[in-house]
Amino acid sequence: MSRRHRAEKREINPDPKFGDLVITKFMNAIMFDGKKSVAERIVYGALDVVESKVKSDPVVLFHQALENVAPHIEVRSRRVGGATYQVPVDVRPDRRRALAVRWLITAARGRNETTMINRLAGELMDAANNRGSAVKKREDVHRMAEANRAFSHYRW
């Protein structure tokens, strides 16, 4: 790990359509090879599909989906006297959001709808209703932390 000063956080502009920073971060995570326009088309298309199916504000549903996927606790490996323990620790708010975004995108890419727009829309609606692969991932992480609660005194 570098001993120099910590890198400064870059200023991110809100997305042009909804004016939401989290949606911008989501777009940046979906983006491949710097193709922001493709990522915008996917995210905005998915939010339009969600709006047409649910008949409510897609941004509220998006934030609800992120909140349902974000983990509160996770396990980290800690080496103590030759043994490696999975120690449950709380997740920082910025990491919570980053993990939720990553898991939502991975789950959407793993679905079998025809286009990425439909896959992402389906995963967002499932996550908002506490279903889907991304929510299952969060529950697995929570279950793992619960199973290793005995090692929580190794927390650092």
From Swiss-Prot:
GO terms for molecular function: rRNA binding; structural constituent of ribosome; tRNA binding. Transmembrane segments: none annotated. One of its GO terms (cellular component) is small ribosomal subunit. InterPro entries: Ribosomal_uS7 (IPR000235), Ribosomal_uS7_bac/org-type (IPR005717), Ribosomal_uS7_CS (IPR020606), Ribosomal_uS7_dom (IPR023798), Ribosomal_uS7_dom_sf (IPR036823). SUPFAM superfamilies: Ribosomal protein S7. One of its GO terms (biological process) is translation. Belongs to the universal ribosomal protein uS7 family. This is Small ribosomal subunit protein uS7.
